[in-house]
């Protein structure tokens, strides 16, 4: 999702929150296949009840300096549009994340954020590999130049610089594999 309107960004996060905050499910399947990215802020805010508070990933510059992306009570620091998520945390449930070769950019950031959660397993095929942090520079004529300025580092310390995220279980039918895994938990 890439919306320039803060109200629409918040509305997107709120719509996701309506479904995530329900407590009548035994597991979550987060299907990021074909999600080509956009703004990580609304996506992470909407999914914030499923993520633990704290550092969810890092941006690392060429000198090795890291800037952490923090989630605290539904608010995200250092990444995407300022959107408010939820302070409520959902009970611990198994979370299946589905990836494919079209899971890209901020959708890959969302996938990496779930490496901080417990009982998560990744299914499908490797992601697109647009795993980097970008900065925007507005030029004199209003044109925006997007520059890759950082790699991504997940909570375990693994660095991703334009490399795909590999699933834990490769599958031609990742939805079925995810459902079977959740039922087995």
Regions found by a protein language model. Give the residues of each.
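C-terminal soluble interaction/assembly domains
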Residues: 124, 130-140
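Bacterial peptidoglycan biogenesis and beta-lactam-recognition machinery
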Residues: 52-59, 115-124
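Short, surface-exposed connector motifs at secondary-structure boundaries
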Residues: 25-28, 90-96, 117-118
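Gly/Ser/Thr-rich loop/hinge elements
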Residues: 37-94, 132-136, 145, 149-155, ...
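Flexible, low-complexity junctional segments that flank or bridge functional domains
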Residues: 1-58, 75-76, 183
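Low-complexity, Gly/Ser/Thr/Pro-rich intrinsically disordered linker/tail segments
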Residues: 161, 165-185
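Extracytoplasmic/secreted envelope proteins and their assembly/folding machinery
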Residues: 10-17, 40-48, 92-95, 107-111, ...
């Amino acid at each position: 999702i890439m919306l320039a309107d803060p109200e629409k960004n918040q509305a997107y996060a709120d719509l996701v929150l309506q479904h995530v905050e329900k407590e009548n499910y035994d597991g979550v399947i987060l299907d990021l296949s074909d999600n080509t990215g956009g703004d990580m802020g609304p996506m992470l805010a909407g999914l914030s009840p499923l993520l633990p508070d704290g550092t969810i990933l890092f941006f690392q510059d060429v000198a090795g300096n890291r800037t952490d992306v923090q989630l605290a009570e539904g608010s995200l620091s250092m990444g995407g549009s300022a959107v408010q998520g939820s302070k409520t945390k959902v009970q611990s449930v198994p979370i299946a994340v589905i990836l494919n070769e079209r899971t890209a950019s901020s959708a890959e950031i969302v996938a990496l954020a779930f490496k901080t959660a417990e009982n998560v397993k990744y299914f499908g095929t490797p992601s697109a590999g647009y795993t980097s942090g970008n900065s925007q520079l507005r030029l004199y004529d209003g044109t925006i130049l997007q520059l890759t300025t950082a790699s991504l580092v997940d909570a375990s310390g693994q660095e991703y610089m334009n490399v795909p995220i590999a699933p834990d279980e490769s599958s031609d039918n990742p939805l079925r594999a995810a459902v079977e895994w959740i039922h087995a938990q």
